[in-house]
Each structure stands twice: as C-alpha cells, then as structure tokens.
C-alpha cells in the first residue's frame, strides 16, 4: 500500500499524534497493570493516572466536582449501549428516529421486540431534519427518554437539539 488515507474517523482517531504513541508506549512499559488491583507500586501508580485523567476530563466536560460520575467505556457503541440498557425498564416508552446509529437502533429494537418497551420513531423530512413538534407529539406520560443524534455523519444534518431539549424538559 502506498499512502494510507483514513476516512473513518468516527470509528477511531487515526493516525494519532506522536505524543500519544510516546505516552502510551511509556505508560505500558512502566504501568501496564490493572489499576487498583492491589497495593503494589505499579497498580497504585496506574490508579493515580486513571484518577488524574478522570479529573481532567470531568473538568473539560464541565462535569461538576464528582469525577467518579465520569465513566470510561470501550467506545461510543459501548457507551450508548450502557446508557440505553441502563435506562430501559418494563413498560416505558422511548422516542427516537431512524437516523440513529445501529448502536442506538439495535438495542431499542431488541427491547421493543421483546415487549419490554414501547417505541416511537419520529419522521424526518426530505433533507434529513427532525422537527421538534414531531418529538413533542410523540411524547407520552410514560416516555422515559428521547434519543436523537446531534449530527448525522451520513447526511451532515445538525438536529435542533436545543429546541428538542426544551421540549423534553417540559
């Protein structure tokens, strides 16, 4: 292969800056153990690096003072599955769109097909936009959550999340 041109940046960030490779190489050579696994030096140091990173990310994302509320996951799919499966309970209603990634559609459809949740997909227009009024009309008394992608990497549409968020708060 001559020159690699990587266009699937949603899957991962590649190539990474050299400083990232250098840090990871150094980290795995010095601290490549499970954090908090026991009291030996490398495990304690690894736990300190994880907690320090968690604190920095909590600050970056304006997460308040409790850095333990920030959860690390394998990737975006894992994160979305953790959130969706953690919120699902028998008898709830969920609102979403068919514009969502499979990491949203698959667990929602599975829970719907199993009879655990009632699921409403709101339509989108010919340009790929979801209209906030359609979200509002789909919400029921037992609606527990609404899942709408902010920006489609397929269509490039940016959904009006501020308006949708206000509707959800009502």
What are these regions (language model features)?
Residues 1-170:
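Pyridoxal 5′-phosphate
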């Amino acid at each position: 292969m001559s020159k690699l041109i990587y266009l699937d940046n949603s899957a991962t960030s590649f190539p990474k800056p050299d400083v990232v490779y250098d840090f990871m190489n150094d980290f795995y050579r010095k601290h490549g153990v499970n954090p908090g696994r026991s009291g030996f030096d490398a495990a304690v140091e690894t736990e300190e690096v994880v907690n320090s990173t968690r604190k920095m990310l909590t600050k970056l994302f304006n997460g308040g003072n409790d850095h333990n509320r920030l959860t690390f996951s394998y990737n975006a799919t894992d994160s979305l599955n953790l959130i969706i499966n953690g919120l699902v309970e028998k008898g709830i209603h969920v609102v979403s769109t068919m514009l969502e990634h499979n990491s949203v559609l698959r667990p929602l459809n599975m829970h719907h097909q199993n009879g655990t949740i009632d699921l409403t997909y709101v339509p989108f227009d010919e340009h790929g936009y979801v209209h906030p009024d359609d979200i509002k009309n789909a919400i029921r008394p037992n609606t527990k959550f609404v899942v709408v992608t902010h920006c489609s990497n397929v269509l490039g549409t940016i959904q009006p999340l501020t308006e949708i968020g206000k509707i959800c708060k009502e």
